[in-house]
């Protein structure tokens, strides 16, 4: 290489050193000073990994004094380049020797890096292009936000999330029956709102006991890192901000915290975008005296644009309580309780018409008359004739029914603010079978009970009942060895025998107390060596994850998982179908919660519920009340808490006493009341609401598309290559999973979201659903999103040189492949990406400037290319510069034309969609007051803003690949 003092070079291996200056040339060595860092490097003149930096006419360069020069001409003297051109500040003709160039110059533009010899590996160019394509595909998906969460693809859940999550500031009531996944629906909506930019700040208000469960659910299922706020956290946060709620974007807190005026005032002032309230049916309200808790939520709902209320079903709440929730969502719409009752009565005709349309028989005259009146502004006669006709294609008739149903849904009822699914309307639940196993009461327990009664002492009726239901706890009060009870308790003997006879089955065991769960694990381990693990509230999240993973493991995993009451909250184990209730809770809702650990949508087997109980004790009497009175073991009992509230005192007396007649009377009265409530609920079912809530065929279509995306092997390959390029260690763990760890040779110093000790991931949804410790990787996962951002936000893969070995083309033939990005700067909340997302535009030019991209696709072209080393690549670029410069200008012409066309298409799509939606909502507002004026105003403003952003769309060169034909 010809070196001269003062020449400017850059290091091919350490480009971060900036622009270097040759300071010594002696013998076979050259010394280069890098002023930006003050470091010297000595190289062999023959093999120095250096690239000479020279600029061309038209380029703008900066002097070390800070002024710029637009180059018009280059001359050379004594081996140094002198640049002639116009001074940026004075406009005068000036010269600038290369020695005086600014040493902090970095080559960020792809063409600058190419001409400076900063040429990247061929595979990195490919990964960069794939990353841009993945980002574009994700941004254009109408299912954005639904693919990534680690949840089962349940139609009604995906439907609700799809419908609600796309709205601006949604205000809805989620009132599904227990076990249908209200928390998942809320999480999906939150995830979608955050991912699409419709929301940035979210406040979740939950009961104290559910804060931890929500924290875990949001992290494990939705990769959302919420922070739990209590009084201590608020005090700590004062160091960072006067308002502690401003220190985090995603916050979970309890109602108790917000009962304090100071904290409520701070929450009201914290600019939330979305408010989520769990267990909202506990907010007590009457027109005369709303509770403090209700007032807290009401105050927040008045200042937060989006509100999600998770609540029990309206059937369970009663009309007044249900009205109180709707009033929080839209006080202008639901302003008077009597008016609400009158409106509900008018829904009966709508429900009758909907039920007729949902069936397959011809419509009765009453239904036709109702439809004609309800849809008076439309001509529905052709649809009615089609439905009533004989010998017509059934698909056409079904389409006509669906169209009329949709018209009803749009115009009537509370379908836009209320979603309620019931097990009666949602398929996919297993059957439940109850298996009672009576055991003889041990003498030790009888003795403990007698001693306790002799000692006397005042206890409440509920405390006495709890004591009678857990004789092992009473026994431990009189024994030094607290674990000795399991040595003689016949329930433990039965449990051991049961597990031994069902060795191939996974068994979930639930007990009330953590101490009981720990004792049972010890009993199984020491007496028979049965593999079991425990799960209780004293364990950390990581410990619980490990226990759950050990239980889920098919080979070498635990046969049994023993949970405490609180420890099992929020965890589901659908892969098991045997449930052992070691004792019974004194609350029907807790019993349903226990069974709900297995009885979820997605459970593939019927559930066998086993109850080993002690005969002639409170355990047997409570079992009879649950089974004979409520049928709570084999069916869900939505009225369970109502019945418990009505019969609690009688039940407690029966449990504490031993009166057979009292028990018989209690069972008879409970059965009668149970049937009355069940009948009332059946009569009150709103068919139209159910149809709207579960989504029908439209929901199934969404799930089918999501399932197809899950099977996309091309995505898996792209993500694996992405991690390979970045340098993430990947270890195959088996069972469809791999372990990702940071490596010492990673391209970037940190990989946000990748823990130092690694993380186990899978691309298989079923595997992720069965293992809490394995993350589900989709293109929405933060590890993928971060990887895409690391590559596309850096210079990785922006330049490349390759050889095409093709004897059909003359040797030396040049092709220039240019990847441009069409983009428009806009806030995420504007939703511009729906119409003009960051879009890669590929241009493939031959030496004459013809664009061959339409004839030669990327994949087939890429397969034919071979890499060249950086040094040779730099020489090829230098030799080709006279050809390349005009090709860049030609490529930009083609790309700009493509961008102009994209903007036209985006504007047409935006105008068509938003104008259509606006017209639809404006016409519906005349007949359905649930259409909010805020939604209409948002659409009008959005159209104006989007047109402004589209006018400012930009074109940017993202990556370059120069290709030369070789016959060697």
Swiss-Prot record:
- Residue ranges occupied by any Helicase ATP-binding domain in the UniProt entry: 163-332
Q: Name one GO biological process term.
A: regulation of DNA-templated transcription
The organism's superkingdom is given as Bacteria
Question: Which GO MF terms are attached to this record?
Answer: ATP binding; DNA binding; helicase activity; hydrolase activity, acting on acid anhydrides
| Record's keyword terms, sorted | Activator, ATP-binding, DNA-binding, Helicase, Hydrolase, Nucleotide-binding, Transcription, Transcription regulation
* Keyword NADP attached: no
Q: Fetch the InterPro entries from UniProt.
A: Helicase_ATP-bd (IPR014001), Helicase_C-like (IPR001650), Helicase_RapA (IPR023949), P-loop_NTPase (IPR027417), RapA_C (IPR022737), SNF2-like_sf (IPR038718), SNF2/RAD54-like_C (IPR049730), SNF2_N (IPR000330)
Q: Where is the short sequence motif DEAH box located?
A: 278-281
> Which Pfam family is one of this chain's hits?
Tudor_RapA
Q: What does this protein do?
A: Transcription regulator that activates transcription by stimulating RNA polymerase (RNAP) recycling in case of stress conditions such as supercoiled DNA or high salt concentrations. Probably acts by releasing the RNAP, when it is trapped or immobilized on tightly supercoiled DNA. Does not activate transcription on linear DNA. Probably not involved in DNA repair.
Please give the subunit comment from the record.
Interacts with the RNAP. Has a higher affinity for the core RNAP than for the holoenzyme. Its ATPase activity is stimulated by binding to RNAP.
Q: Which family does it belong to?
A: Belongs to the SNF2/RAD54 helicase family. RapA subfamily.
Output this protein's name: RNA polymerase-associated protein RapA
Identify the taxonomic lineage of the organism of origin.
Bacteria, Pseudomonadati, Pseudomonadota, Gammaproteobacteria, Alteromonadales
The gene is rapA
């Amino acid at each position: 290489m010809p070196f001269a003092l003062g020449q400017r070079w850059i290091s091919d291996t350490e480009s971060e050193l900036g622009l270097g200056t040759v300071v010594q040339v002696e013998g076979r060595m050259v010394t280069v000073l890098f002023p930006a860092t003050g470091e010297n490097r000595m190289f062999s003149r023959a093999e120095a990994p250096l690239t000479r930096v020279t600029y061309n006419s038209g380029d703008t360069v900066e002097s070390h004094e800070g002024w710029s020069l637009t180059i018009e001409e280059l001359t050379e003297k004594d081996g140094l380049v002198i640049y002639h051109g116009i001074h940026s500040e004075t406009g005068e003709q000036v010269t600038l020797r290369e020695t005086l160039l600014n040493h902090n110059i970095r080559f960020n533009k792809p063409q600058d890096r190419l001409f400076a010899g900063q040429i990247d590996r061929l595979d990195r160019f490919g990964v960069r292009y794939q990353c841009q394509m993945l980002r574009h595909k994700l941004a254009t998906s109408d299912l954005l936000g639904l693919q990534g969460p680690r949840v089962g693809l349940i139609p009604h859940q995906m439907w609700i999330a799809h419908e609600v999550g796309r709205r601006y500031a949604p205000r809805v009531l989620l009132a599904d029956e227990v076990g249908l996944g209200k928390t998942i629906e809320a999480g999906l909506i939150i995830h979608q709102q955050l991912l699409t930019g419709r929301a940035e700040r979210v406040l979740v208000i939950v009961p104290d006991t559910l804060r931890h469960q929500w924290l875990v659910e949001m992290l494990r299922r939705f990769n959302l890192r919420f922070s739990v706020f209590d009084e201590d956290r608020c005090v700590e946060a004062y160091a960072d901000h006067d308002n502690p709620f401003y220190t985090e974007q995603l916050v979970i807190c309890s109602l108790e915290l917000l009962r304090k005026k100071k904290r409520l005032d701070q929450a009201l002032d914290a600019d939330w975008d979305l408010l989520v309230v769990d267990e909202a049916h506990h907010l007590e309200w009457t027109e005369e005296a709303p509770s403090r808790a209700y007032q807290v939520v009401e105050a927040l709902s008045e200042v937060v644009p989006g509100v999600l209320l998770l609540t029990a079903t309206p059937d369970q709440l009663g009309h007044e309580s249900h009205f109180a929730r709707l009033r929080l969502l839209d006080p202008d719409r639901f302003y008077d309780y009597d008016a609400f009752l009158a409106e509900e009565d008018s829904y009966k005709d709508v429900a009758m018409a909907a039920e007729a349309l949902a069936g397959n028989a011809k419509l009765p005259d009453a239904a036709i008359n109702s439809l004609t009146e309800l849809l008076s502004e439309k001509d529905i006669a052709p649809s009615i004739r089609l439905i009533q006709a004989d010998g017509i294609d059934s698909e056409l008739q079904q389409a006509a029914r669906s169209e009329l149903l949709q018209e009803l849904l749009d115009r009537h009822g509370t379908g836009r603010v209320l979603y309620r699914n019931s097990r009666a309307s949602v398929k996919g639940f297993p059957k439940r079978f109850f298996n009672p196993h009576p055991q003889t009461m041990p003498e030790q327990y009888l003795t403990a009970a007698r001693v306790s009664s002799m000692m006397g002492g005042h206890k409440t009726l509920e405390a006495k009942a709890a004591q009678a239901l857990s004789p092992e706890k009473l026994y431990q009060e009189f024994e030094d060895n607290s674990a000795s009870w399991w040595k003689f308790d016949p329930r433990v003997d039965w449990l051991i025998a049961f597990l031994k006879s069902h060795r191939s089955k996974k068994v979930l065991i639930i007990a009330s107390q953590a101490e009981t769960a720990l004792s049972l694990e010890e009993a199984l381990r020491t007496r028979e060596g049965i593999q079991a693990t425990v799960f209780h509230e004293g364990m950390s999240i990581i410990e619980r994850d490990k226990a759950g993973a050990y239980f889920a493991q098919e080979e070498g995993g635990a046969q049994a998982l023993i949970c405490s009451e609180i420890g099992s909250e929020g965890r589901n184990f659908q892969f098991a179908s045997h449930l052992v209730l070691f004792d019974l809770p004194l609350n029907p809702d807790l019993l349903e919660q226990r069974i709900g650990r297995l009885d979820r949508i997605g459970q593939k087997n019927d559930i066998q519920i086993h109850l080993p109980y002690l005969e002639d004790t409170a355990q047997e009497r409570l079992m009879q009340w649950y089974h004979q009175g409520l049928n709570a073991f084999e069916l869900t009992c939505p009225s369970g808490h109502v019945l418990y509230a009505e019969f609690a005192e009688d039940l407690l007396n029966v449990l504490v006493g031993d009166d057979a007649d009292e028990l018989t009377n209690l069972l008879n009265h409970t059965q009668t009341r149970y049937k009355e409530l069940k009948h009332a609920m059946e009569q009150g079912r709103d068919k139209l609401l159910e149809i709207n809530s579960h989504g029908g065929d439209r929901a199934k279509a969404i799930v089918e598309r999501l399932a197809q995306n899950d099977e996309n092997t091309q995505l898996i390959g792209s993500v694996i290559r992405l991690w390979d390029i970045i340098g993430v260690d990947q270890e195959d763990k088996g069972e469809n999973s791999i372990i990702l760890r940071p490596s010492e040779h990673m391209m970037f110093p940190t990989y946000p979201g990748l823990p130092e000790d690694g993380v186990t991931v899978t691309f298989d949804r079923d595997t992720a659903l069965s293992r809490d410790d394995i993350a589900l990787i989709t293109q929405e996962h933060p590890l993928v999103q971060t990887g895409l951002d690391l590559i596309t936000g850096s210079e990785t893969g922006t330049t490349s040189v390759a050889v095409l070995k093709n004897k059909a083309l003359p040797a030396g033939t040049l092709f220039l492949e240019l990847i441009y990005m069409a983009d428009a700067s806009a806030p995420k909340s504007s939703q511009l990406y729906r119409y003009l997302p960051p879009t890669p535009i590929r241009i493939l030019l031959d030496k004459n400037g013809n664009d061959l991209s339409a004839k030669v696709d990327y994949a087939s072209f890429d397969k034919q290319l071979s890499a060249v080393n950086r040094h040779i690549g730099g020489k090829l670029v230098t030799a080709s510069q006279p050809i390349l410069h005009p090709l860049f200008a030609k490529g930009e012409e083609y790309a700009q034309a493509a961008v102009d066309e994209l903007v036209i298409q985006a504007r047409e799509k935006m105008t068509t969609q938003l104008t259509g939606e606006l017209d639809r909502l404006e016409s519906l507002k005349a007949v359905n007051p649930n259409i909010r004026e805020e939604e209409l105003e948002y659409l009008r403003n959005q159209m104006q803003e989007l047109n402004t952003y589209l006018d400012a769309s930009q074109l940017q060169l993202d990556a370059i690949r120069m290709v030369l034909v070789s016959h060697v």
